[in-house]
C-alpha cells in the first residue's frame, strides 16, 4: 500500500493560498484590463487614438498580390495631431490613390505608423516592428522633432517600445493614456493639464469630481504596474546613437543624419523602397532657418551615401504649405484638415513614381 500523502501544515496551506490569491489577482486584473483596453481601442482608434497593433486607423489585412503598400513614419505631423485618423496625411493620400493603377499594382494602401514626438531615431525600431506588413515603400517624414540638435540629449523617443506588452506581443495598450487624460480633463477641464509642471496652478474641482478622477488614475496606475512587471522580462538595452560623426553632417545635425542613415539602410536591406520627405518649413525666421539647415545637411548626406540607388528618393515639401496660414495650420506647426489635404496631394506623384519603379523591378 502506498503511503498516504503528508497533510500540509497550516502555514503551508496559508502560503499556497496567498500565492494562489496573488496569481488569480494578477490574471484576473489582466483579463479585466485587457477587456477594457480592447473596448477603448474600438472607441478611440478612429479619433485621436490608435488600433490594438499600435498604429493609427483600422488594422490592415494580409497584403494582396496587386497591392502596393506604403508605410508613413514620423511624429505628430504624420500622425495627424489635431485631426481624426481619416483626415491625417496617410489616410488622405490613400483616398487620393484609390482607382489608380501602376503596372501590376491596382490597389494602394497607406499605413500611418507615425506618433507624437517620434524623431528619426525611432524609424529603425518602427520599420522592424512592422516588417510583417510587407511594405513596399517606407516614407520617412520628420525633422521637427529633431530640431533641438542637442548631442547631450537627442530625441530617443520610441513610444511603442515604452510598452513591455508591445515589445513582447505587438499589442499596444491604450487605457493608461485614455484614463490619465480623462482624469486630467475631469480635474482641470483640459487633457493638457497632465503635462503641466507640479507648480502650475489649476482650479480645484469638488470632492466627488476629484474622487471620480482618482478612480481613473488608480486604474491607469494598475495597468502601468502590470507593464512594469512584464518589463523585467522584456528589458531592452539603453538607447543611444552610434557613431554620429560618421554621417558627415555639420554640427548639430550629426545624430539626426546618423539616425536617418540607419533607417534608410534598414529599409533597403529588407527589400523596401524609401521616400525621404522634408516637411513644410517652420514658421518664423529662426524656426525656418534652423529647419532649412537641418534638411539641407540631411539631403546632402543622402546624396553622398545613396547616390544612384533607384530605390531611394528625396523630395522637399518645404514650400508646399505656409504654416502662417490659419486655414492650413492651427498652431504654425500642425496642419488642419485642409493643410493635410494639400500635403497629401503633393505626395501622390512621388508615390506613383516609386510604384512604377517597383513595377519595373518585377519585369
Tell what function each PLM region has.
Residues 1-71, 82-84, 102, 121, ...:
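N-terminal secretory targeting modules
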